[in-house]
Curated annotation (Swiss-Prot):
It comes from Mus musculus. Induction: In smooth muscle and endothelial cells by leukotriene D4, by tumor necrosis factor in endothelial cells and by uric acid crystals in macrophages. Its main location: nucleus. Expressed in the brain, with highest levels in hippocampal neurons, cerebellar granular cell layer and Purkinje cells. Signal peptide: none annotated. This is Phospholipase A-2-activating protein. Disruption phenotype: Mice die perinatally and exhibit spleen, lung and brain developmental anomalies. Display less matured and differentiated embryonic cortical neurons. Display reduced ubiquitin-dependent membrane protein trafficking from early to late endosomes. Show reduced prostaglandin E2 biosynthesis in embryonic brain, lung and heart, but not in liver at 18 dpc. It comes from the Eukaryota.
Amino acid sequence: MASGASRYRLSCSLPGHELDVRGLVCCLYPPGAFVSVSRDRTTRLWAPDSPNRGFTEMHCMSGHSNFVSCVCIIPSSDIYPHGLIATGGNDHNICIFSLDSPMPLYILKGHKDTVCSLSSGKFGTLLSGSWDTTAKVWLNDKCMMTLQGHTAAVWAVKILPEQGLMLTGSADKTIKLWKAGRCERTFLGHEDCVRGLAILSETEFLSCANDASIRRWQITGECLEVYFGHTNYIYSISVFPNSKDFVTTAEDRSLRIWKHGECAQTIRLPAQSIWCCCVLENGDIVVGASDGIIRVFTESEERTASAEEIKAFERELSQATIDSKTGDLGDINAEQLPGREHLSEPGTREGQTRLIRDGERVEAYQWSVSDGRWIKIGDVVGSSGANQQTSGKVLYEGKEFDYVFSIDVNEGGPSYKLPYNVSDDPWLVAYNFLQKNDLNPMFLDQVAKFIIDNTKGQTLGLGNTSFSDPFTGGGRYVPGTSGPSNTVQTADPFTGAGRYMPGSAGMDTTMTGVDPFTGNSAYRSAASKTVNIYFPKKEALTFDQANPTQILGKLKELNGTAPEEKKLTEDDLVLLEKILSLICNNSSEKPTAQQLQILWKAINWPEDIVFPALDILRLSIKHPNVNENFCNEKGDQFSSHLINLLNPKGKPANQLLALRTFCNCFVSQAGQKLMMSQRESLMSHAIELKSGSNKNIHIALATLTLNYSVCFHKDHNIEGKAQCLSVISTILEVVQDLEATFRLLVALGTLISDDSNAIQLAKSLGVDSQIKKYVSVSEPAKVSECCRLVLHLL
């Protein structure tokens, strides 16, 4: 730190907490305020007294039954324009406060050990880390997903809301990057527990650890820099408003201020553990320590404490004791230390430490460049950076690529770089290029074709395609044998020779066919215009196909093996045959109460023989009278019985038919009402079936989610949409069947149509990155077409 440069000095000290201050965060309101949490079980809101002098405790909030370890601010909403305060504690709970509430508005329960880190995102999303080795994602008062993968406490968490990314740092020495509930990347480098994370930009972040180092990372995985300066555990890290410089606090009794990648100033404090820090909008630094005192440091002369207050602080510092085992003092041989005369020699750098012997005592001093003197920091009792560079054939943004093309979108305008490796999917690269540079997604095929042609990849022909019902596959898509020429030979796809020209007749790709949902009306799609025939879906999708003869034959066969008290009589079987006949033949006749009673008896058979009865139920539940009887009159009893059949250890046939029955319930008002009331329980049980390999179950799961999406498109319930989006994201991780994938895409499109909040929530879950791979699916064409339409909304 050069002489004359601005220097942080004490602004004020804020007593109030009775024990260690463990967490600090800047507040949205009032301006310039901050919140602190402590081992004394309280949360306190501090507001500035005036533009230049001190803070006053405005509110003291209680709610935890043990010490409070972390805090964050949830952004403002229509209901809470000043935002909310979230605190995590040793009682395993997260308390949510409004700014004027002494007690929690609500408490989030789910962690099994201390909640030690919190970070907020958009629309009420909250990420928590715990000693139980997990992180949890919350929306309002609901846990949406649990992130599992660390093998020790999750000490630090951060959300990057714009990219839908989440970061977790752990005592297992690793940092993990999560997207839509899955671990995308693990960052290795720290040699001890990771204690803190801070976001620099959309592509970079900082971490600090018990190994006394700070690391700067790219989200792609590269460690760009390692900073050394602290000599003990680093507990917290906070970034300045310029998003470049930062501050850290540690077990070495110091606050360190880092500018331009170097430690510009070291401030010692009269406490052993400097637990936490935050940087206010005006650049002032707030620090919490093990002595229960909050201290504010400033560069501003106007906000600097009085000379008397600074002298009192230095006196307190000089009276502190330093453990030689935890300080940065090295091996000490008191007999070889110089005397006080050594203090007449100036230091060589800001924060330099010097030990002198004064009789039997060993005193520690720190050099202040701006003051030009040695300041005593206590009585003793008891780093260089590293750059990582890569080299290769073509280097772009720190990574090696086989090709880096320059793309001119507008003649005479700026060019864009398009990096590509031969092992990459050209459609994914093209999609990422268009998204990154905010270019029209309708150019996807042209950019992908450009990549293929210029890297000697295989040319994929496009031709006339006829569309079909995307759910049944009737009249399925068959690639055309001829079509318009889309040849682009070694040319920039936007402005190069032989380039694609939007609206050019020679480049149009014509597609004709029927509406894939209704079978009516042909449509025409060109590169400049895409007709969305897929979503939002307005009506529930049902499972209708059946072979009544086979169903009844199996029912009669298994009836012989049923327990005596469960067996059906010949008359009972006749009644079931009649109800099945009138359902399958669309008869206007209504099922009788006796028929419904026998059907209820049959679906309560033992699990190993019940499936043909469930198949009759699946078909019958679409009838208004059956739907009313089972979904309204029997209601909870009916849904509980079917939910029990979804047990992952149960029989796949029962699981499948129960799911299909739930899907068919949506056709009537009574069924919709029951499905909405049972949504949380049903979806949480249904999602447990995702990990199996049965494609029919995956299709049924996707259809159930789609039918819920139809309901939520009419009723904008953000919590319900959030659960559906989470389920979609979870199933997408394991699904292989393209029909199930297509239905999930339609569900996703239905959920986010005309709803900016749902779009942002989907982005925060990283769903857009999950579905990108489907833009290159050639058959069935409905998958890639629907995917592109969804991505256009995202």
